[in-house]
Amino acid sequence: AVCVSLLGASSIRPLPLHLGQFNNMIKCTIPGSTPWWDFSDYGCYCGYGGSGTPVDQLDRCCQTHDNCYTEAQKFSGCSPYRRKYSYECSEGTLTCKSDNDECAAFVCNCDRLAAICFAGAPYNSNNVDIDLEARCQ
């Protein structure tokens, strides 16, 4: 069983630094969660890409986050998927630090608002790994 576990773990791609930060922001607002597993294949917008009508409130959080990243890309040289930023988590409260440049501050705020949104949205396991072609038009 240990070998299977180790082999399974070796096939998981590591998160880029910034997405690791987003992952940790979600853990701050939802203690005990496993964001990469819980949200990476949820609804029409949580995970890579996105299209159609969000299936619920949580999926709308992801759509808003996607749109925020699109806005971040309008800053010269700003790549939200790779941008490192400074933030603080204190007792479930997220704060983007003032030493971030314009791009980092924007991306940090995208992630902060999404993490807060996730924490306030119900999680419906029926919306995990859905048929994107049928439900996301």
UniProtKB/Swiss-Prot annotation:
CDD domains documented for this protein: PLA2c
Pfam families: Phospholip_A2_1
Reaction(s) the record says it catalyses: a 1,2-diacyl-sn-glycero-3-phosphocholine + H2O = a 1-acyl-sn-glycero-3-phosphocholine + a fatty acid + H(+)
InterPro entries, per the entry: PLipase_A2, PLipase_A2_Asp_AS, PLipase_A2_dom, PLipase_A2_dom_sf, PLipase_A2_His_AS
EC code: 3.1.1.4
Amino-acid positions noted as binding Ca(2+) in the UniProt annotation, renumbered to this chain: Y45, G47, G49, D66
Signal peptide: 1-17
Cofactor(s), by name: Ca(2+)
Enzyme class: hydrolase
Function: Snake venom phospholipase A2 (PLA2) that may act in the hemostasis system of the prey. Exhibits hydrolytic activities, and prefers the anionic micelles (dPPC with deoxycholate) (54 umol/mg/min) to the zwitterionic micelles (dPPC with Triton X-100) (15 umol/mg/min). PLA2 catalyzes the calcium-dependent hydrolysis of the 2-acyl groups in 3-sn-phosphoglycerides.
Localization terms from the record: Secreted
Similarity annotation: Belongs to the phospholipase A2 family. Group I subfamily. D49 sub-subfamily.
One BP term from GO: lipid catabolic process
Protein name: Acidic phospholipase A2 PL-II
Tissues/organs with expression: Expressed by the venom gland.
A single MF term (Gene Ontology): toxin activity
SS bonds (residue pairs): C28-C89, C44-C136, C46-C62, C61-C117, C68-C110, C78-C103, C96-C108
